[in-house]
Amino acid sequence: MRIMQLDRHSLGFPSPEQALHDPNGLLAIGGDLQPARLLQAYQRGIFPWFSPGELILWWSPDPRAVLVPQALHISHSLRKALRRTTLRITLNQAFAAVIAGCAEQRAEGTWIGPSIQQAYCQLHQLGHAHSVEVWQEERLVGGLYGVAQGSLFCGESMFSRVSNASKMALWSFCSHFQRMGGQLIDCQVLNAHTASLGAHDIPRRRYLQHLLNCRSQTLAPRCWLPQSLTLPLPATATQIGE
């Protein structure tokens, strides 16, 4: 099957069902990262992933990794860290710094090049992309970012500069997102780290149905306002890898 070359003058995408099996999920190449195209992609269960300086690659893998917010696993070590931490968590207060931190952590292997950073900062300014920040006093030490689709949040990347910072960001966000009406977090492709946190694979067709349903659901009006988030203590600990 041939891969579709996107036209810069059209925002259309092929059906995700046309994506390759090898490499898993590759659907189209080219186009650009203008906000309208990115939003069209996320609405169809498609996301960009490519190395800086290369053609833009668009993906919709099968299966798809997802995380139910209330099913996030908390390890014994993280549970202890939550009891002792002095870190504080905020929402939508330093988006550009968070995405830069995600790029920095991956160094030579990053896919978060300047064009990706610029594009997602534009989405943030338009109210579609959001960040969670972890602070040690006034220093940014961790965080995550992603794109909202109604009651579904498409997680893109996270980073830590101190132990457990990104996990605390995710735990705090999951609690907040669930309270605001959030239903599901898209983790894209399952790996050992996301699996240890409770993510699991579902068939792409099922993910696309979830996406369709979630896109029409609205969250509490204050969900994405810049604010401080709490770090609630989990009621019970689920033992996972340290």
UniProtKB/Swiss-Prot annotation:
Q: Name one GO biological process term.
A: protein catabolic process
Q: Matching Pfam families, A to Z?
A: Leu_Phe_trans
**Could you name the Gene Ontology cellular component terms for this entry?**
cytoplasm
Keyword Repeat, does the record have it? no
Output the Gene Ontology terms for molecular function. leucyl-tRNA--protein transferase activity
* EC number from the UniProt entry: 2.3.2.6
Q: Where does the protein end up? A: Cytoplasm
Gene3D superfamilies membership: Leucyl/phenylalanyl-tRNA-protein transferase, C-terminal domain, Leucyl/phenylalanyl-tRNA-protein transferase, N-terminal domain
Catalytic reaction equation(s): N-terminal L-lysyl-[protein] + L-leucyl-tRNA(Leu) = N-terminal L-leucyl-L-lysyl-[protein] + tRNA(Leu) + H(+); N-terminal L-arginyl-[protein] + L-leucyl-tRNA(Leu) = N-terminal L-leucyl-L-arginyl-[protein] + tRNA(Leu) + H(+); L-phenylalanyl-tRNA(Phe) + an N-terminal L-alpha-aminoacyl-[protein] = an N-terminal L-phenylalanyl-L-alpha-aminoacyl-[protein] + tRNA(Phe)
Functional summary from the UniProt entry: Functions in the N-end rule pathway of protein degradation where it conjugates Leu, Phe and, less efficiently, Met from aminoacyl-tRNAs to the N-termini of proteins containing an N-terminal arginine or lysine.
What this protein is called in its record is: Leucyl/phenylalanyl-tRNA--protein transferase
Q: Which organism is it from?
A: Edwardsiella ictaluri (strain 93-146)
